[in-house]
C-alpha cells in the first residue's frame, strides 16, 4: 500500500524533484506548481518545519540531509520555525489557479501560511 504519489518518475528523479520543490518553497515562501506536486510537497515541507520546531542538533542534521541549501536550513531554524511554534501542523496553504494552457494540468500556488 503506497502512501505517496509516483508522479510519473523513477524514484531517484522523484525524490530529487520533491527535495528541490521543498527547498524552493522554504526559500521563497510560495511557489507555483501542479496540484499533485503541491500535495506531495506539502507533505514533506510540513515534516521539515515540524523537525525545525524541535530545534536540536539531530533535527538540524535530518533537515540538512533533505533540504539542498544550507542557507535555507539556517533560515528555517532561525525565522520560519519560531513563527509556527504554537501551531500544530497546517503550515502551508494550496490555492488553485486553474488549468495550464499547454496540457490543461491543474495549477496551484502553495505557500507558507
Curated annotation (Swiss-Prot):
An annotated GO BP:
translation
A single GO CC term, please?
cytosolic large ribosomal subunit
Matches recorded under InterPro entries:
Ribosomal_bL17 (IPR000456), Ribosomal_bL17_CS (IPR047859), Ribosomal_bL17_sf (IPR036373)
Which family is this protein grouped under? Belongs to the bacterial ribosomal protein bL17 family.
Instruction: Give the gene that encodes this protein.
Output: rplQ
Q: Write down the Gene3D superfamilies for this protein, in alphabetical order.
A: Ribosomal protein L17
GO terms (molecular function) for this protein are:
structural constituent of ribosome
What PANTHER family has UniProt attached to this entry? LARGE RIBOSOMAL SUBUNIT PROTEIN BL17M, RIBOSOMAL PROTEIN L17
What NCBIfam families does the entry give? L17 (TIGR00059)
Coiled coil (residue ranges): none
Q: What is this protein called?
A: Large ribosomal subunit protein bL17
Identify the keywords attached in UniProt to this record, alphabetized. Ribonucleoprotein, Ribosomal protein
Please describe the quaternary structure of this protein. Part of the 50S ribosomal subunit. Contacts protein L32.
